């Protein structure tokens, strides 16, 4: 079993309130779940108005499939946030359990 965890740190420069920031993050989380069927949540920088963190977890029996899903999630996030937020950093952890 392969698990891949992604921690995506976002810059949301146009947000002037936590409500505006959370609207961007919540929309991203919901669309990731609906489109890619991955586990995801807002996990950090909760009180920062112009920044946020989203965690994504992928589990697969096949390393190639898991990596492909992680790559697809990154591309989806970039496209989804275009003009609304920027990706500051993506931390990736890959674990294999036998």
Task: Give each language-model segment a name.
Residues 9, 15, 43-46, 94:
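Generic secondary-structure boundary/loop-capping signal
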Residues 27, 53-55, 71:
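Residue-level signature of transmembrane alpha-helix interfaces in integral membrane proteins
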